[in-house]
Swiss-Prot record:
Signal peptide range in chain numbering: none
Top-rank taxon, per record: Bacteria
Name of the protein this chain belongs to: Ribonuclease HII
EC class: hydrolase
Domain RNase H type-2 residues, every copy: 72-257
Amino acid sequence: MQTMTIKEAENVLKEIMNEEDDRFQLLMKDDRKGVQKLVLKWYKQKELEQKEKEKFFEMSKYENALREKGITYIAGIDEVGRGPLAGPVVTAAVVLPEDFYIPGLNDSKKLSEAKRERFYDEIKVQAIAIGVGIVSPQVIDDINIYQATKQAMLDAVANLSCTPQHLLIDAMKLPTPIPQTSIIKGDAKSVSISAASIIAKVTRDRMMKELGEKYPEYGFEQHMGYGTKQHLEAIEVHGVLDEHRKSFAPIKDMIQK
């Protein structure tokens, strides 16, 4: 075993699933520092995987409870973009299969952009159905952001390719006959809502990046329409766009000056 290089040991550890593996027992006895570091790394990785598995199982409790009642089509719903000064509010409704599993799934705001993009692609492949609802700044100004968010959520449900039997919604109640459960901080407590938050976030971010290309002086691709110092300074210099929400302060005050 001493003849195995560090690189070979690293590759072998990638194949090993549990401590009972004979190869693992041999590597445990290898006293080279490089090998022992790899063994420690393996333990940490397995610990992380176990925590992610437990977290995922905990986040599946709402879905599992409904499935035990014979409910199959469960739509998780979430929104992104209630707070920004520019751009639409975007919602997603996602129906997942019973065998859906993506370790590390969480509230989209807690994930790196790279992870969100990867999870977005995986959810697209695994989901039974995905619906997206987008409400423009003009409609937000007309009916207010709360009503616009509800409208976007209803649109997302309507855009599903199947009719959901139950809705799991992040902190909202919708005017629909479909049975629903409102969950505070649902994007961190339900896999379906978490998946919806990722679809909504990536969809909106891509739209704001396109807006950034159209209006490079505003830096939309950096702040996604939120009221950062950079964004407010750009509005002061270059003015208010159609994409801005005129009913939101401080834009409302700028227009009234």
